């Protein structure tokens, strides 16, 4: 492949989705520049990405709220565009600590946007979320659904989307793509990188795999009285490698044509219940996964899955990994790294 020689800043590039996206960037010929404060990620992830790709990666241990340090990276970096992952993402914690979430996710993004504007780097791929749809009345969800978050985390994504729309409306040089993720699962097929929450996991799959491997005595399932086929919540689980590739498709689109500000769903278009995912992981791991039903979690919705047809039509992207792939790769990562990156 001919080198593209584009330097792409990746905020939060040491995190779960960020690290997988960095691999795809390198494979597509881009040069990633990672900016991460390592608050919920690990330097080991970057080392392993270097091992997978055979490339040395530029890394800056910088918080996006540190305006001076971030400014210096833009000054010297010759950055063409930015993929913005950095942010806090625990729904439950956001209900308890809303100011922390508004400060980090909104004020931090404003710091980044001001510097991008200053340095005339006006192309952004933003890591949004399906939480901006709140509790949808019908599924599948299209991008023109009404937006209303049910928790502070979702509201931070919603507010940033509004800021980006205002920015693009005020200045035609700005181009932003907002990727509304559904539920990322799985890991790189090498088993070298995957989801390694430093504290309490925010996503279902680490709970399931940690229970299967014996790190947790029992899996708690939040509610079995939803209006779904088996009573447990239904979600659009998407393989993290598919999600990462979606960012490359978005970046390619940003670089090739005038966008304005556009939102895309990144999902499979298929919902699986929590119990279905537990069953699939049980098959992949050949392990028993004891579970208990506990009360619903505040802010959780019954069913959420995407209509991803707009991303296929306009970005040429679609998810290719199925449920078995997701569970196989999640289990490979967990079984090879029982304690995550701290095993290294």
From Swiss-Prot:
Homodimer. This is UDP-glucose 4-epimerase. The keyword Isomerase applies. The lineage of its organism: Eukaryota, Amoebozoa, Evosea, Eumycetozoa, Dictyostelia. SUPFAM superfamilies: NAD(P)-binding Rossmann-fold domains. Pathway: Carbohydrate metabolism; galactose metabolism. Catalyzes two distinct but analogous reactions: the reversible epimerization of UDP-glucose to UDP-galactose and the reversible epimerization of UDP-N-acetylglucosamine to UDP-N-acetylgalactosamine. The reaction with UDP-Gal plays a critical role in the Leloir pathway of galactose catabolism in which galactose is converted to the glycolytic intermediate glucose 6-phosphate. It contributes to the catabolism of dietary galactose and enables the endogenous biosynthesis of both UDP-Gal and UDP-GalNAc when exogenous sources are limited. GO terms for molecular function: UDP-glucose 4-epimerase activity; UDP-N-acetylglucosamine 4-epimerase activity. One of its GO terms (biological process) is galactose metabolic process. The active site is at residue 153. The gene is galE. Keywords: Carbohydrate metabolism, Galactose metabolism, Isomerase, NAD. NAD(+) binds at residues 15-17, 36-40, 63-64, 85, 89, 157, 181. It comes from Dictyostelium discoideum (Social amoeba). After the expression has peaked the enzyme is released to the surrounding media. Its cofactor is NAD(+). Gene3D superfamilies: NAD(P)-binding Rossmann-like Domain (3.40.50.720), UDP-galactose 4-epimerase, domain 1 (3.90.25.10). One of its GO terms (cellular component) is cytosol. It comes from the Eukaryota. Belongs to the NAD(P)-dependent epimerase/dehydratase family. It is an enzyme of class 5 (isomerase). The keyword Isomerase applies. NCBIfam families: galE (TIGR01179), PRK10675.1 (NF007956).
